[in-house]
């Protein structure tokens, strides 16, 4: 590891506090993963070859499954298993159950993420299950494994990770990230007793509007009682009373490591910043909750203010406080000091720029043409700048108060029929204001649900700030100066002339947002989604200056 800069007075005080905390930390706050026979399945130097075979009708049905907007706030899974034959590195397995996976950003009908469940006899390398993520938001194929690497170094239970090339019915779907499935075999790697309660959070938190986003993987009734008890403890107005109630149910010291590590790797779409993509395990030995990362394919990327559904965090890079547990703990002065100390400790022990950059180079060479150079450069830039940015914030001390999260549920309701046309050119996303009237929008609702601009423009291109997604944006300036944006995110495999793309559920849609430009930077307010319709691409010339034209129609679902 590179030697850290010579510490100033503030850093020296943090170091002393860290040492003092180490002596009294809970026994389970620093996890080390046990060696396991299945480690061969996660050899980082080996790209697995996974070939899936199932009937064409089953494959068509599987790839099109997904959540509807009506059940976005539901904890019920929209996916079902199909029977397949799976070959992994030449080892063939019959009667394997396969299903689609994903909640929001990773959903794809062209390259769906997959879960494989093998029969009673163990699968390849002794695995019972395989989880294959499509890296829909990460064309570098780096972010997930790097995040879990740092989490593991921070003493946080984290899945093992490597890569796989996946084909279905002979069609090469490209490189996927292969991670541990979150079940008892994984829990045994870190916990003496794997029979406790396991929870998954997808837009889930310990507050009434978000409690339905926490799925219980074990005994539903008993687990719900525990969640209600933790919710009650977090609602106590007195800080001391709140902290005692939380400490009886959560290993706070272990949570500090998880919390700080999420900010360290820029996991804006995790628990602390977006109440999303997390697991937690209630250890039967002490009845306390331990948090674990999940779905970090948007980490190691520039953090933009208000990035993510429901995210209200300011520009701080060193701490996230949207999650209710994070927000309430941050109110306590002693916890803030411990958090600062823990973050500095992780910078000194778990954040090794040379090793991380070497890992980026190794994986990039291993995967070759399957990685996107622009996305790799983003990851490298994040690694090089994180320490200085975070230590600058720690040096001045974190503010005593941050913006409190809004507890309105992220649910959507159909309120308007919307249609429109666009005729623009490619590679024009840098435009920030109306320059031509290259689009038209009709918004039918009674009463009106938005203040519609009088004129619209359209831009199109590949957005590096959206993981190099192909986007078309229809935008108009209101008299107030705010900009209304309908932003279509399009699967690159479908971006071609003559394509008729269904807008349905959370796979293909347009985000409807309001932008307010301020001296400190743009403020983004999500309004809802345009879906349940169709996007028609008449002409697609995806080169700089090429023509992009078409039309759209659908239903606007308002976020409430």
Model-derived segments and their meaning:
Residues 9-10, 268:
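Residue-level micro-sites within transmembrane alpha helices that shape
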Residues 11-22:
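Bacterial N-terminal signal peptides
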Residues 24-482, 492-510, 514-546, 556-560:
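Phosphate/dinucleotide-binding and metal-coordinating scaffold of catalytic cores
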């Amino acid at each position: 590891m590179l030697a850290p800069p010579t510490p100033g007075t503030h850093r020296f005080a943090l170091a002393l506090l860290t040492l003092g905390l180490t002596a009294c930390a809970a026994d389970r706050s620093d996890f080390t993963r046990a060696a396991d026979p299945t480690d061969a399945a996660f050899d980082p130097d080996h790209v697995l070859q996974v070939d899936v075979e199932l009937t064409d009708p089953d494959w068509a049905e599987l790839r099109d499954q997904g959540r509807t907007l009506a059940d976005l706030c539901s904890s019920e899974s929209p996916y079902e298993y199909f029977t397949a034959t799976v070959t992994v590195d030449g080892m063939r397995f019959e009667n394997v159950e396969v299903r689609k996976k994903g909640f929001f950003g990773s959903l794809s009908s062209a390259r769906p993420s997959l879960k494989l469940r093998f029969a009673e006899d163990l699968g390849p390398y002794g695995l019972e299950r395989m989880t294959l993520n499509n890296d829909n938001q990460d064309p570098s194929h780096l972010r997930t494994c790097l995040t879990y690497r740092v989490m593991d170094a921070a003493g946080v239970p984290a899945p093992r990770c490597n890569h796989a090339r996946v084909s279905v019915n002979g069609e090469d779907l490209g490189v996927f990230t292969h991670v541990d499935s979150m079940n008892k075999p994984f829990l045994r790697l870190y916990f003496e007793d794997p029979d406790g309660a396991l929870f998954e959070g997808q837009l889930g938190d310990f507050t009434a509007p978000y409690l339905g986003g926490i799925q219980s993987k074990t005994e539903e009734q008993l687990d719900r009682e525990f969640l209600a008890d933790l919710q009650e403890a977090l609602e106590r107005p007195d800080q001391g009373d709140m902290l005692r109630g939380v400490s009886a149910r959560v290993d706070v010291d272990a949570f500090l490591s998880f919390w700080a590590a999420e900010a360290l790797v820029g996991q804006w779409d995790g628990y602390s910043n977006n109440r999303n993509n997390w697991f937690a395990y209630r250890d039967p030995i002490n009845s306390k909750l331990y948090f674990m990362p999940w779905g970090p394919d948007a980490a190691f990327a520039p953090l933009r203010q208000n990035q993510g559904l429901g995210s209200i965090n300011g520009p701080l890079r060193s701490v996230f406080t949207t999650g209710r547990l994070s927000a309430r703990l941050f109110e306590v002065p002693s916890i803030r000091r411990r958090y600062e100390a823990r973050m500095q400790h992780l910078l000194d022990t778990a954040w090794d720029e040379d090793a991380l950059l070497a890992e980026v180079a190794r994986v990039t060479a291993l995967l070759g043409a399957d990685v996107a150079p622009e996305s790799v450069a983003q990851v490298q830039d994040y690694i090089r700048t994180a320490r200085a940015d975070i230590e600058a914030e720690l040096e001045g001390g974190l503010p005593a108060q941050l913006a409190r999260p809004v507890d309105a549920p992220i649910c959507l309701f159909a309120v308007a029929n919307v249609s429109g046309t666009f005729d623009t050119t490619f590679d024009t996303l840098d435009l920030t204001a109306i320059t031509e009237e290259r689009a038209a929008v009709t918004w039918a609702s009674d009463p009106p649900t938005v203040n519609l601009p009088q004129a619209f423009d359209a831009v199109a291109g590949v957005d590096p700030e959206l993981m190099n997604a192909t986007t078309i944006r229809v935008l108009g300036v209101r008299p107030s100066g705010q900009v209304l944006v309908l932003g279509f995110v399009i699967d690159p495999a479908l971006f071609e002339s003559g394509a008729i793309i269904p807008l349905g559920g959370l796979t293909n849609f347009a985000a409807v947002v309001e932008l307010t430009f301020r001296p400190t930077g743009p403020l983004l307010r999500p309004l809802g989604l345009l879906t349940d319709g169709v996007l028609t691409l008449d002409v697609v010339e995806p080169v700089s200056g090429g023509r992009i034209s078409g039309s759209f129609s659908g239903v606007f679902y308002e976020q409430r």
